[in-house]
Amino acid sequence: MSYLLVDVGSTFTKAALVDDRGGLLARAAVPTTVGPGRDVLEGVAGVCRALGPGGSVPDPLDPAERDRVLVCSSAGGGLRLAVVGYERAVTAEAGHRVGLSAGAKVVHVATGRLTTAGVADLRAARPDVVLLVGGTDGGNAEVLLHNARRLARSRVGAPVVVAGNVEAQEEVAAELARTLRRATLTDNVLPRIGVVHPGPARRAIREVFLEHVIGGKGLSRGPRFAQLVRAATPDAVLAGVEVLADVRGGDVMVVDVGGATTDVYSVLTPQGEDASLRKHVVATLWHARTVEGDLGMRWGAPGVLEAAAAEALPVADDPQLRSWVERVHARPELLPTTAQEHEHDLVLATTAATVAARRHGRPGAPGEAPRPLKDVRLLLGSGGVLRHAAPGAADRVLAAVLADHGGGWRPPADAGTRVDTAYLLFAAGLLAGERPDLARAVAAQL
C-alpha cells in the first residue's frame, strides 16, 4: 500500500509517493494550475500522472482512497493571519511567533486598544484568520475585552481564534457571539510572564484554516480540494522538522530559500532561562519558524541586495549582480544559463540564507538573548536553488551560514550540513499525525 503526499504551492505542485515502510517510490512536480478558469485539482491530477502509471498512485478523488492522500497548500497566498494583542513586546509578540509557527503569513499586528483607524488597517490587511491575544491568565482583561467588542462590531469577516487570558474567555466569546462571529477558543499563548504556550493556538489556527479558509480561496470549483488539505505548507514543514529532530536525536535548523521569501525553521532542546533575560519579555519558542518576506531568489531578489547593504555585506556593491537581480525580478521564470549567471544565483542564495539565519538567531526584542542555536547538530538546506545546484554549490551556501560569526547571533558550533534534495520535509510533516512510523522513516532519509 502506498501513500500520496502532495504540496500545492503557489508556483509548483509537488508530490511524493511512499510505500508502507516509508520508502520513496517516486516524486514529481508540475506547474500549479491557478488563475481564472483553472482548478488546482488539474495540477494534482497532473502530478499524479507524472508519478507513475494508472493504478500505482492513490486517486485523490476516490473516497475509498482518500485516507492515503495527504495534501498541504500554500497556493492562493497561503494562510494570512492578523494578530491583535496588548503590548507589542509581550502578548502581541507571542502571538506573532505562534502564528509563524502555525505556518501563517502574518500580514498585520495590532497592539493596544483597537481604534477606528486600527480596525480599518486590520481590514485592509485582508486576513484569513484573526488571532486575538492579550493578558496572562488571571491578569488584566480590559484590553482583550475592548478588542473583542471592536472586532464584533467591525466589518472584518475573518474567523477569530481567541488565545488570551483564559479567565476572560467566556466574556470574549459572548461579545463575539453578539454579532455571530466565528470564534474558536483555545489556551493562552502567554499564560504567565516569560512562558509561551504555542501548541493549542497552533492547532486551533490549523483547524480554522482547514474548516473556514482553504475552501474559500477560489482555488477549486468544488469542495473536494478543501477536503483533501490537511495543513498549510509551512505548518507541514515545521512538523517535518520536528520529526527530523526526533529521529536525529538533536537540534535541527532548516534554511529554505525560495523565489519570494526565505524561511528558517529550528527545533531546539529546551534550556534553562538565560540569566540576562528580562522578566517582561517573551520566552524562547523552541519549535520556531521565521519568514523573511524581503529575501528571495526572484520576486524577493531586490530585497536581498537591500539587506546586504544594511548588513554591510560586500555583495551589495557588485554592478553585475545588481543587473542580474533587475532581470530576474522582472522575469521570475528566468533561469541561469552561463557560469556567471549561476554564480550570481549562488551569491543571492548565500546572502539570503545568511541574512535570514541572522534574523532568526538574533534577539527578538531588547533584553532577550540570541536564539540558542549553538548546539544545532544539523543544518538542512531547502529550496529549488539548493536542490538543483551544481555539486558543491549548496555546500558553499550552508558553509557561509555556519561561518557567519559577525552577524549578531550565535551560529551552530559543530553542525553537519545536508540538502533536502528529494523535498521530503513536507511529506514527513503530513505523515506525522496519521502515520508517525512512516513519518520517521521518511525523515530518516534526509
Predicted regions and their residues:
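Long, internal scaffold/assembly segments composed of regular secondary structure
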Residues: L228-P302, E306-A307
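A glycine- and small/hydrophobic-rich beta-loop-beta segment
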Residues: V304-G364
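Nucleotide/phosphate-binding catalytic cleft detector across ATP-hydrolyzing
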Residues: M1-L5, D20-G22, V30-R38, E42-A45, ...
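Short glycine-rich, Thr/Ser-proximal phosphate-binding strand/loop in the N-terminal lobe
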Residues: F12-V40, S101-K105, L277-A301
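Short acidic-glycine loop/turn motifs at beta-strand connectors
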Residues: D19-G23, A75, G258-T261, L268-Q271, ...
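Short acidic (Asp/Glu) and glycine-rich catalytic loops that position anionic groups and cofactors
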Residues: G23-L25, A288-T290, R327-P336, A403-R410
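Short beta-strand scaffold segments in enzyme catalytic cores
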Residues: T13-D19, L81, V254, T262-V267
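Asp-based phosphoryl-transfer active-site loop
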Residues: L4-K14, D256-T262, L379-S382
